[in-house]
């Protein structure tokens, strides 16, 4: 609950595979899913124990952008890679920072995903509709923050930072910017309400829900458990007669039609 206590989303290094032929690169970022609660069931609890819903106007104010989902082998990614290599070979590194700004918003449409709870061999990231904000990389050096970390340096940073990828920079918010909080269990709801009071929260309209409640009440996770009516032999016979009547109304020799289609 540090985010609520500090009223700040802190940037953290997040590893991204921007090119299929190089190691991962970790950029400092803050990420959100642009999904309504009705489409949130697949992602509840996937990246952490609780979720915070913020207003779209707050996101626009701080400058979030949709992630650019690309295929590793697309012409776009290949062109960016060629430009980056050219700039890295120049005497003054030219537009290297600007190109890395673009790379920081690129994410594969599908790739492997491993979280603390579960792993996927082929996860479709584009379904998350991720919004992301990355600080201006060129300005980070003056704040003693590395603009990006390659794989080994990223692991070393986490070891030196108590296994955390967070940095000191962040984006603050007002209580009025928070729409809801989703906690893990029903017992956590009262605890979070008390915490908000101790944090001097003055927004009484913040909804606090627990994960199973959201899945069952808002999304309808129980719909698959509804018993479907069983058809009797009489019902089946009646349906078969209707099909026969429809075929007679539109007499088409289906077998010949299929054969002709295959021959063509």
Regions found by a protein language model. Give the residues of each.
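NAD-dependent ADP-ribosyltransferases
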Residues: 1-264
């Amino acid at each position: 609950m540090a985010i609520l206590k500090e009223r700040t989303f802190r940037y953290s290094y997040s590893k991204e595979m921007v090119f299929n032929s190089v190691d991962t690169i970790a950029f400092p970022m803050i990420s959100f899913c642009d999904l309504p609660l009705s489409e949130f069931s697949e992602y509840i609890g996937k990246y952490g124990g609780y979720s915070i819903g913020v207003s779209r106007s707050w996101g626009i104010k701080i400058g979030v952008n949709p992630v650019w989902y690309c295929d590793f082998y697309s012409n776009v990614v290949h062109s960016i890679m060629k430009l980056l290599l050219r700039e890295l070979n120049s005497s003054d590194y030219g537009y290297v920072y600007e190109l890395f700004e673009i790379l920081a918003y690129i994410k594969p449409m599908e790739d492997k995903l491993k979280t603390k709870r579960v792993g996927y061999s082929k996860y479709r990231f584009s379904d998350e509709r991720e919004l992301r904000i990355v600080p201006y990389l060129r300005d980070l050096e003056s704040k003693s923050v590395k603009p990006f970390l390659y794989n080994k340096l990223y692991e070393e940073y986490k070891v030196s930072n108590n296994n955390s990828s967070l940095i000191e920079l962040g984006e603050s918010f007002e209580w009025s910017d928070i729409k809801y909080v989703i906690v893990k269990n029903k017992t956590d709801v009262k605890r979070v309400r008390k915490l908000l009071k101790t944090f001097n929260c003055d927004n009484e309209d913040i909804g606090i829900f627990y994960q199973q409640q959201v899945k069952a009440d808002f999304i309808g996770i129980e719909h698959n458990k509804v018993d479907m009516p069983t058809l009797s032999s009489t019902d089946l016979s009646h349906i078969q007669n209707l099909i026969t009547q429809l075929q007679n109304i539109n007499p088409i020799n289906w077998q010949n039609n299929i054969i002709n289609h295959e021959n063509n």
